[in-house]
């Protein structure tokens, strides 16, 4: 019972779309109506509001971190299994991608996935963050950086995560993020993906 409740709460936390919330607070257009149409930090940055983009990034990462950390703190008192923690991690990302509070139209999950990984394994999250930074500064293409870091996540998890269920969860998280980036993959292959801060 507690396992199911933990997963449900994690999904609801993940469903808080900070791109939409922050944009509304600053009186900006809904990020789903301009640029790529994705409610995420990169698209909010296209509005020219760097502070709003930064807050979106922090909020989306924080909700993944909080959802999983909360479950880990309560794991022993509530008798949550390691598999339940893995499910909680997935639920936070699913909530971000298909949020119940915003018509199931969510983001691509990069920041939230990073927050989730930070709660499961700081070392895994650090590896992914470093790869993202190197690729982002080197190529100035956010999606390429995200895809590279995403592919690296399950490999890093093999070395740093203590439970098999968490490694499988990381693999599923990576597959979901890759799925949500399918249009970006096409643009990358066609050489028309926008640069960080670009208008497309």
From Swiss-Prot:
Give the membrane topology, semicolon-separated if more than one.
Answer: Multi-pass membrane protein
Q: Identify the pathway.
A: Lipid metabolism; phospholipid metabolism
Q: A single GO BP annotation from the record? A: phospholipid biosynthetic process
Sorted alphabetically, the keyword list is: Cell inner membrane, Cell membrane, Lipid biosynthesis, Lipid metabolism, Membrane, Phospholipid biosynthesis, Phospholipid metabolism, Transferase, Transmembrane, Transmembrane helix
Location comes to: Cell inner membrane
Report if keyword Lipid biosynthesis is assigned. yes
Protein's recorded name: Glycerol-3-phosphate acyltransferase
Name the major location.
Answer: membrane
Q: Extract the NCBIfam families matched here.
A: glycerol-3-phosphate 1-O-acyltransferase PlsY
Entry's Gene Ontology cellular component terms: plasma membrane
Q: Describe the subunit structure.
A: Probably interacts with PlsX.
The catalytic activity, as recorded, is:
an acyl phosphate + sn-glycerol 3-phosphate = a 1-acyl-sn-glycero-3-phosphate + phosphate
Pfam families named among the record's database cross-references = G3P_acyltransf
Please give the InterPro entries that the UniProt record associates with this protein: G3P_acylTferase_PlsY
